[in-house]
């Protein structure tokens, strides 16, 4: 088995936020460093994700994503989900909203073509259990 390099797009957060790199630029930079695998963070680099009550990202986004993966010889490996429990200033997310958010991340991960999802530490186990059959 050959070990291959993977890079989290989180590594490029500074360049992305300051406008030095866009999503494609981050992927290109990772590929230039010899990365094959790409870990994604939708909230950070995928515009419109995840606005409450908004539909999933459009198919055109995923078409462009797969074109970029092909162009740079990379592959999505894992999606790093972030459960924004403080999305609303007046209250925390309730259980059903957290499950819905995780289900959206599961759909997103599948559409990206990633094989896994990394659930962050603040995601309650009962939310993961409720979303797992999805």
Q: Where are the regions a protein language model picked out?
A:
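Short, solvent-exposed loop/turn segments at secondary-structure junctions
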Residues: 12, 45, 83-84
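Catalytic domains of carbohydrate-active enzymes, especially glycoside hydrolases
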Residues: 22-45, 111-113
């Amino acid at each position: 088995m050959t070990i291959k390099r993977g890079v989290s797009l989180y590594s490029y957060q500074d360049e992305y936020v300051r406008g030095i790199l866009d999503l494609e630029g981050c992927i290109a930079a990772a590929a230039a460093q010899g990365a094959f695998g790409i870990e994604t963070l939708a909230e950070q680099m995928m515009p419109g994700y995840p606005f409450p009550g908004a539909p999933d990202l459009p198919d055109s986004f995923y078409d462009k994503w797969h074109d970029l993966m092909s162009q740079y010889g990379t592959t999505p490996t894992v999606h790093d989900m972030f459960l924004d429990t403080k999305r609303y200033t007046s209250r925390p997310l309730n259980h059903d909203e957290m499950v819905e958010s995780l289900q959206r991340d599961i759909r997103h991960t599948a559409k990206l073509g990633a094989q896994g999802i990394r659930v962050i530490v603040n995601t309650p186990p009962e939310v993961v259990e409720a979303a797992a059959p999805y």
